[in-house]
Amino acid sequence: AQGAPAAGALRWELPGWAGSVDLLLIATPDGTEPGLSLLADQAYRRGCTVVAVAPARTPLAEAVEGAHGLFVPMATAPYEQEAPLTASAPGVLWALLTPFLAILDRTGLLTAPPDILEKIAGRLDHIAERCGPAIATYSNPAKTLAAELADALPVIWTEGTSAGPAGRRFAAALAELSGRPSVVAELPEALAAHSTLLSGPLAAGADPDDFFRDRVEEPPALHARVVLLRDRPIGGLSAAPAARDLALSHDTPISELEPESGGEIETLAELIAVTDFAAVYLALASGA
């Protein structure tokens, strides 16, 4: 059994119904969290199967092996060996998620055979070529998005199965990498949830004196900018036109990202990759 974690340390509890027919998946770029080791031990006592992806030779690795679970060492690049990894660091998500995709494919919970994983890798390579630092802003969607968000509060609206998690990931990356706040919601609920926000003090036309602001001495006021992430609509049904109308009716600029056609995981990969690049460019620009 594991010792008690220090006061204030994060702890996780299994739901009361978890038992021998359940599978616990643990993913972390750290592996030293006492709470996760305790969670693996709790799962073992409940009869749950435990699978974890984390750095090798960590307390979590030992706990999972002690629980007779499956431990998969997290893949890292050579330059990442010394630097601490954060959950939103570029590349960390896929190093943690890819083993789970393969495992869940084998268990039948989703479809991600080797050819799908190869397509995901190809899509990520393609985005890296389009969004890399050597590509000029005018043809680089990530640099363009970062420039548009430089002095804005990102209001992230998502539509579609893949866009939802990509939007939440983008908000997390903005906060963790560049220290920037944002709000995120799914369409069509976002239209009602954020309507007042777009008409309040964050609206583009909220400060009439901004026209006379000293551009050198006074920092720009923070205004909202809608970022619309969406999958290709099925059957032509989409709330995107209403979203554009709402934003424009409040003089709020809007940025849109729509992935190329493909499977759900491929489109998810593209949206995450582009927004990850944008978050990194914002972090570099702000010196975070």
Predicted regions and their residues:
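Extended, charge-rich low-complexity interaction segments
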Residues: 35-44, 210-237, 281-288
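Residues at the starts of beta-strands that form the adenosine-phosphate
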Residues: 47-50, 153, 225, 253
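C-terminal functional modules
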Residues: 268, 272-288
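A generic structural motif
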Residues: 1-2, 53-55, 74-76, 180-192, ...
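C-terminal hydrophobic structural anchor segments
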Residues: 219-275
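Glycine-rich phosphate-binding loops that contact phosphosugars or nucleotide phosphates
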Residues: 1-126, 231-234, 241-251
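Short hydrophobic beta-strand segments
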Residues: 26, 153-159, 225-229
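Active-site phosphate/pyrophosphate-binding segments
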Residues: 86-89, 105-216, 288
